[in-house]
A protein has these predicted regions:
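N-terminal cationic amphipathic segment used for targeting or macromolecule association
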Residues: 31-34, 45
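C-terminal motif of bacterial Sec signal peptides marking the signal peptidase cleavage site
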Residues: 40-44
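Exported/periplasmic ABC-transporter solute-binding proteins
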Residues: 45-302
Length: 302
């Protein structure tokens, strides 16, 4: 992805071999130091997490998204879990929020841009809060991108919409998550027609707002946004059932080969608990143990 406001780290493949050797031994030294330090911490990685007394809490209700969800795929990959500890499967962001808000023992995950404080709260992860600054600098451990994809050539109106997303539309993206570039002036060519967009429930609110604002500029266009999940959206784009697919997960190699993609925003996966839960911070290691069914009660975190 082009680096604008979202920062990612890349490795230069042309580094001199001697530099690589120096870096190797520095890394070994840091590893040994961190190994010694790690034994003093509550968690196996990240910053120290202070866990309050949770003896009054009960069995953890582990809430996951459904198979095919881009949020689930990214969460599982980033945490390194097989999610065998899942108790409740929710097939949308709203259902995750509803489940966690109604159960003080529940834990779940949603798009940071969707967190609305309605009976739930987002936890810090490894001491880092999910916010625009930590996402922009890629400091929060559970960052991910929002992607629009298409197969083959776009229609004139779809091209015009994409031009809007890449320019003035970035101001709309900024209201939800971190944009990938500064907003720029957009001049529509006023192409007419319909654009079908399918996929991620996490990306859908942003894309729906982009569509709404674009149609104000170009009344000849009709942009239809249908929510399903990232995998379905990608498959629909591959098979020609829509003009654009929305994904909140990274593309598989074969998807990247067959589809043209554009990252239009950077977001994070927020870990949420009931607002009555006294926990404020959690480590990636703890999340893995919860979702792997190694921690089944809140008291296991201490």
């Amino acid at each position: 992805m082009t680096k604008y406001k979202c920062e990612r780290t890349y490795i230069d493949s042309n580094i001199d071999r001697s530099c690589k050797r120096d870096r190797y031994w520095k890394m070994i030294g840091k590893f040994l130091a961190m190994t010694a330090l790690g034994s003093l911490l509550l968690t196996g990685c990240g910053a120290k997490v202070d866990v309050p007394d949770m003896s009054s809490m009960g069995t953890i209700n582990v809430v996951s998204r459904e198979e095919g969800s881009g949020t689930k795929t990214e969460f599982d990959n980033l945490v390194g879990t097989d999610a065998t500890g899942t108790n409740t499967v929710a097939d949308s962001t709203d259902k995750v929020i509803s489940e966690v808000a109604s159960d003080k023992n529940a834990i779940g995950y949603i798009a940071y841009s969707a967190e609305n404080n309605s009976g739930v709260k987002a936890l810090d992860v490894d001491g880092v809060a999910p916010d625009a600054a930590s996402i922009e600098k890629d400091k929060y451990p559970l960052c991910r991108d929002y992607i629009l994809v298409y197969n083959g050539e776009l229609s004139a109106v779809a091209k015009d919409f994409m031009a809007y997303v890449k320019s003035a539309g970035q101001a709309v993206v900024a209201d939800y998550c971190v944009p990938v570039k500064k907003s720029e002036t957009f001049l529509s060519d006023k192409s007419g027609g319909t654009v079908e967009i399918h996929g991620s429930t996490s990306a859908a609110p942003i894309v729906s707002k982009l569509a709404e604002e674009y149609m104000k500029i170009n009344p000849a266009a009709k942009i239809l946004v249908t929510e399903s999940d990232s995998t379905q959206g990608l498959n629909d784009a591959l098979q020609g059932r829509c003009d654009l697919g929305m994904s909140s997960r990274s593309l598989q190699p074969y998807e990247s080969e067959l589809l043209t993609s554009y990252v239009f925003g950077c977001d994070a996966i927020a870990v949420i608990v009931n607002s009555e839960n006294t926990l404020s911070d959690i480590s990636v290691d703890m999340l893995k143990k919860i979702y792997d069914k190694k921690y089944t009660a809140w008291s296991d975190l201490r």
